Amino acid sequence: PWAGSIDVVSGGFPCQDISTAGKRAGIDGQRSGMWKHMARVVGEVRPAFVFVENSPALTFRGLGTVLGDLAEMGVDAAWGVPSAADFGAPHLRERIWIVARHPHQGDERAKRRVQDSGPDAGRVRADPSGWWATESGVGRVADGVAHRSHRFAAAGNGQVARVAAGAFTLLASRLKPNVF
């Protein structure tokens, strides 16, 4: 019932079996094996885009499975392992990111939504000083949690929102036809 009505399926399946700090069982491990359920959802929903995040160790503990499953569904994919430092953060925090899309599905709709998603949509780089500001540049005293910060909770504790946005933009631009 969801086919064609969902634009993006995004997620990071558990990495405990993939990570070098974990059990190293790979993508067929008890926890990381959740990929097969994410793949099932992608196959049933057929979103315009799929956005996946995981440990960079996925490159040798299951990336072939993920890309193969996506290819079997007729989905084009691009992947990379950017770090938070690549987007201006003062720490490394490498993650693998995969962006996939169904060819010719949602081209104009997706492009319009990304372009119209707000004034910060195209900003991926941090302040040129190399450090991200903790206070607003408006010249007032902070009196609580920043506006819209609750949205970042959906990304998880280990994610840097600018990296996710930058990875999506970079990888989606590699797919044909080019969305950006």
Identify the role of each PLM range.
Residues 1-8, 15-161, 178-179:
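Class I S-adenosyl-L-methionine
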